[in-house]
Amino acid sequence: MSLFDWFADRRKGQFVGKVTQESEESDGLWEKCPECGQVVYRKDLIDNCSVCSNCGHHNRIDSKERIRIISDPNTFKSINNNLTPVDPLGFKDRRAYADRLRESQASTGLKDGVLTGTCEVNSIPMALAVMDFRFMGGSMGSVVGEKITRLIEHSTKEKLPLLIVCASGGARMQEGMLSLMQMAKISGALERHRDAQLLYMPLLTHPTTGGVTASFAMLGDLILAEPKALIGFAGRRVIEQTLREKLPDNFQTAEYLQDHGFVDTIVPRTELKETLAKILRLHKTQEVKLQTNA
C-alpha cells in the first residue's frame, strides 16, 4: 500500500466514524454533560436519574420522569389534572397569552405546569405535586395554584404526607393578580394541613424562584433541595444593583441556603427515593406513638 493510499484510508475511516457518531447522537443515543463535557450513553444517564456519573451534574428532567424516579411503579394516581388554564385578561405582550398556552400544551403534552396525584414510596402512601419547568418556565397561574391547593386539601382529608417538587420562575405575569392570589391560597391550605399534624416537604430543584419561593417552597416541615439548585426570590443582578454590592459566587444556591439555615438538607437525586422513604417511615412511627400516648 502506498503512503497516499494509507492516508486516503485514514481519511475515509475518520469520515465514516464521524458520520456514525453524528448519526448516533442524532438518534439520541448519547448526551453531553453541560457541566463537565463528558459524553454519556443516554440509557446509562436515565438509569442514573439523569445525573452525570462523572461530575454529579443534575440535568433538568420533566414531571413524568420525576414521578417515575420518586414513586413505586404503577402507584401514581392522577388528581385534578383535567383542569385547563384560560386567558381571563386577554393578555398580550410580544405574543398573546392564549398562543403561549397552546404552544406549551402542544410541546409538553400537559394542560398546565404541574402534575398532582397520590403515589407510594417504598409502599408508603403520599400525596405528590411535581412542577414542570418546560411549561412556561413552571410559572404559577390560577390552575397551578388550584391544583396544588386541591391536592393539599385531599392530603389533609386522607391524612397523607405531602411532597411538592418545585421548579418555577415564579408567579405567571400573564394572569396578573390572579396568579399572586395563589400564594396566599396555597399557604392557607398548608396551614390547615399543618394543623392536622401532617408532614409537608418541599423539594427545591433548579430553578425555584419568585412567588413560589416566597410562599409554599419555604413552608415545609423539612425543606429538601437538589445539589447546586438555583433558589431565590429576585434575580442576582437586581439584588446587586439594589444593594450596590457584589454577591458571593455561590449566592442563591442550595448549598448557600443550607449554610444559612434556609434549607434543611441537600439530597442527590439518586438518593431521593430512599431518603423520602426513611423520612416517611420515621414520621409514621412518630404518628403511631402519639396516637398510643393519646
From Swiss-Prot:
One GO location term (cellular component): acetyl-CoA carboxylase complex
GO biological process: fatty acid biosynthetic process; malonyl-CoA biosynthetic process
Cofactor note: Binds 1 zinc ion per subunit.
Pathway it works in: Lipid metabolism; malonyl-CoA biosynthesis; malonyl-CoA from acetyl-CoA: step 1/1
The reaction(s) this protein catalyses: N(6)-carboxybiotinyl-L-lysyl-[protein] + acetyl-CoA = N(6)-biotinyl-L-lysyl-[protein] + malonyl-CoA
Gene3D superfamilies (UniProt xref): 2-enoyl-CoA Hydratase, Chain A, domain 1 (3.90.226.10)
InterPro entries assigned to the protein according to its UniProt record, in alphabetical order: AcCoA_carboxyl_beta, Acetyl_CoA_COase_Trfase_b_su, ClpP/crotonase-like_dom_sf, COA_CT_N, Znf-ACC
CC cofactor: Zn(2+)
Binding positions for Zn(2+) per the UniProt entry: 33, 36, 52, 55
EC number(s) from the headed UniProt entry: 2.1.3.15
Keyword terms of this UniProt record: ATP-binding, Cytoplasm, Fatty acid biosynthesis, Fatty acid metabolism, Lipid biosynthesis, Lipid metabolism, Metal-binding, Nucleotide-binding, Transferase, Zinc, Zinc-finger
Family of the protein in this entry: Belongs to the AccD/PCCB family.
Matches recorded under HAMAP family: AcetylCoA_CT_beta
Record-given protein name: Acetyl-coenzyme A carboxylase carboxyl transferase subunit beta
Organism for this UniProt entry: Prochlorococcus marinus (strain NATL1A)
Lineage: Bacteria, Bacillati, Cyanobacteriota, Cyanophyceae, Synechococcales
The encoding gene: accD
